Amino acid sequence: MNIVALVDCNSFYASCETIFKPDLSKKPIVVLSNNDGCVIARSSEAKKLGIKMGVPFFEIKQIIKKYPVHVFSSNYSLYGNISSRVMGVLKEHCDRLEVYSIDEAFLILNKYSERSFVSRAEGIKKIIRKWIGIPVSIGIANNKTLSKVANHLAKKDELGSQVVEIINQKQIEISLKVLGVGDIWGIGARIEKFLQKNSIYTAYDLYKTDPRWVRQHLGVVGERTYRELHGEICIPIVERSEPKKQCRVSRSFESYVTSFHDLEKRIISYATRASEKIRSCLLYTSPSPRDLST
């Protein structure tokens, strides 16, 4: 059986900052972009205070005055180093590894019996926490899309093990019923609105949709996602991708952007995401130039 585990570091940048400041564990933390302009990472405690991703720093100063929020300038050298350590541990505990981003990786666990998948994942989680100091959530499923679903649920289980397995049909259907359609891996904001206009609100609604309708309206990519929700394997694990000549992060605006302030927030958010994608490509290479602090 092909088993995929998605390991995702919890609030990665904020967690990296607490490694050397353990007294800040469970405290609200935000990390700012290089010029300290916008928020690019938040601990779960900061999220609960209503601090949004990409918001300009000056807009949250009142929250910082009211609550003991700890603020850090981004330190990409540190984050890259910690990420490499996490990926190194993962590589030693799986059959195949795909580094998906600086804080996420897909693992293939083929060689282990089905009964050991959850216990194996819990063991990996404990090792990363003990050796490196980073908390992770792990989702286990038959393919990458469902492992993303499982990981989404695992992150919400803050008081539990944060390891969720959805292997059989019953587990899949229960999980999809509590997941919004926009939370499915590969479903962007535009497609989400289109699906909602067609009375498809949850992942389970899409799961139960006629496959011919999916192919007609969502194309090949949408059909691939649909098939993965049904347990098929359509998106392979890529251990070593071809060298990329460019990196792009783009979104279509729903309406005209007339405010420079709004445009600035979008640009910073997308530039930060593009930087993360580039850094993840360089984790196991000899980057040139070596200074990627921009």
Where on the chain are the PLM-derived regions?
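Long, highly charged, low-complexity intrinsically disordered interaction regions
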Residues: R120, I124, I128-V178
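Short acidic, glycine/serine/threonine-rich loops at helix termini
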Residues: C16-T18, A41-S44, L146-A154, G219, ...
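Short Gly/Ser/Thr- and Asp/Glu-enriched loop/turn motifs at secondary-structure junctions
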Residues: Y100-E104, A141-K144, L283-S286
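DNA-contacting surface of Y-family translesion DNA polymerases
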Residues: L6, Q196-S286
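Conserved small/polar residues in nucleotide/adenosyl-binding loops
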Residues: Y284-T294
